[in-house]
UniProtKB/Swiss-Prot annotation:
Keyword Lyase carried by entry: no
Protein name per its UniProtKB record: Exodeoxyribonuclease 7 large subunit
HAMAP family: Exonuc_7_L
GO CC aspect terms: cytoplasm; exodeoxyribonuclease VII complex
Gene behind the chain: xseA
Principal location listed in the UniProt entry: cytoplasm
EC number: 3.1.11.6
Reactions listed under catalytic activity: Exonucleolytic cleavage in either 5'- to 3'- or 3'- to 5'-direction to yield nucleoside 5'-phosphates
């Protein structure tokens, strides 16, 4: 066999090179054509052919992309498809793997939608900073939608089930057709200007891009952005997006979800109220217990400072003072008696008669009678003088003459001056034959 300088390839190698060339040379492409040979096996994938009058290309749309289609693919339907070129190596088939497909009439609308969305986004109409928050408790709601569509039934059903107390005004409008956008815009502006509503809901059910086109109107988008009342947009299904969704304060994927966002579930509210009541009862019981404890402490303090308790305390103090006074008086009397006894002993020791007897004995010892007589007279005079001096200082003598010794019962001190006592003060007066208690009366000193 002759030697060859060219590289020799196997079919699989050649198909792999061709696939790499196709996938690397062509970006994401859009194709408008007619559907043919449509099949959907049990795997959920979608296989068909796109053709025009002169050519055709095999196409595949794998699950789950095929499940999001908004229409039913059928023979002869004209579509706008987007995908990437590739090569199925096992058969060498050149094909287009799609990730999006819509009916062909929507192509121009899609391009217009993308252009307007980009322009409004550049103006900042979609910015989160300009969007308003929904009120915590919605009391009045305006619903702009078709009065006969499925959307209004879904919304009203959810609202009635979750929160029947909500006041809802249905503002009927066309939601499809040439005049729908202007009518929705007018109703929105009037509802916002009235100041009556807490939230305005714009909604309708699903449909094609053309069916939903009223909600991509530029005037409606700008009216939503200018509204002072928070606006919720719930247009179509979860996969549908309109300009009203982007510019609204809140976008809900479906009308039912919008209703759930706007009101709480009354069952959850009841549960929350019950929890709050239980908590309030617990707090009340705790507060009542604390108040009762404080009341008990105050009652104890009041009893401790009540007049009766005060009188009892004063009575105990009076009894104690009486005991102390009695003890003091006893001590004072004992001291006075001791002083009297000492004075009596001193008087007895200086008794003139005893002294006179001694002198007489001494006189008898003296022989000159005259000298003895003079000496005796002199001594008698001295004795009388001493006796008078002793009698002058004898307390018993003073008491015996009708005087009294006045002392304070509390400490036994002797009162020497009227200036030392006060009106009403109780004193003790010691007399010759006993003692009496006296009280100082007001008067001149």
């Amino acid at each position: 066999m002759a030697e060859r300088n060219e590289q020799i390839l196997t079919p699989s190698q050649l198909n792999a090179l061709a696939r790499d060339l196709l996938e690397g040379s062509f970006p994401l492409v859009w194709v408008e054509a007619e559907l043919s040979s449509v099949t959907r096996p049990s795997s959920g994938h979608l296989y068909f052919t796109l053709k025009d009058a002169r050519a055709q290309i095999r196409c595949a749309m794998f699950k789950p992309k095929s499940t999001w289609l908004k229409f039913q693919p059928r023979e002869g339907l004209r579509v706008l498809a987007r995908g990437r070129l590739t090569l199925y190596e096992a058969r060498g088939d050149y094909q287009l793997v799609l990730d999006h497909m819509e009916e062909a009439g929507e192509g121009a609308l899609r391009r217009a939608f993308d252009a307007l969305r980009a322009r409004l986004a550049a103006e900042g109409l979609f910015d989160a900073e300009r969007k308003q928050s929904l009120p915590a408790h919605v009391q009045r709601l305006a619903v702009i939608t078709s009065p006969s569509g499925a959307a209004v039934r879904d919304v009203l059903s959810v609202l009635a089930r979750r929160f029947p107390l909500l006041e809802v005004d249905l503002l009927p409008s066309l939601v499809q057709g040439d005049s729908a956008a202007a009518q929705i815009t007018s109703l929105l502006q009037r509802a916002d200007a009235s100041g009556r509503y807490d939230v305005i809901l714009i909604t309708r059910g699903g449909g094609s891009l053309e069916d939903l086109w009223a909600f991509n109107d530029e005037r409606l988008a700008r009216a939503i952005a200018a509204a002072q009342t928070p606006v919720v947009s719930a247009v179509g299904h979860e996969t549908d997006f309109s300009l009203s969704d982007f510019v609204a304060d809140v976008r809900a994927p479906t009308p039912s979800v919008a209703a759930e966002l706007l009101v709480p579930d009354q069952r959850e509210l009841v549960a929350r109220v019950r929890r709050a009541q239980a908590r309030m009862t617990q707090l009340q019981q705790h507060a009542l217990g604390n108040a009762m404890q404080r009341a008990d402490r105050l009652a104890l303090r009041l009893r401790a400072h009540s007049p009766q308790a005060r009188l009892q305390l004063l009575h105990r103090r009076q009894e104690e003072a009486g005991r102390q006074l009695g003890a003091r008086m006893t001590q004072v009397l004992e001291r006075l008696q001791a002083r009297v006894q000492r004075g009596h002993a001193q008087v007895q020791s200086h008794n003139p008669q005893r002294h006179l007897a001694g002198l007489q004995q001494r006189l008898r010892a003296l022989h000159p009678q005259a000298a003895m007589q003079r000496r005796l007279q002199h001594d008698q005079l001295q004795l009388r003088s001493i006796a008078r001096s002793l009698e002058a200082v004898n307390p018993l003598a003073t008491v015996a003459r009708g005087y009294a010794i006045v002392t304070r019962p509390a400490d036994g001190s002797v009162v020497r001056s009227a200036a030392e006592v006060a009106a009403g003060e109780r004193l003790r007066a010691q007399l010759a034959d006993g003692s009496i208690e006296v009280r100082v009366e007001p008067g001149e000193r």
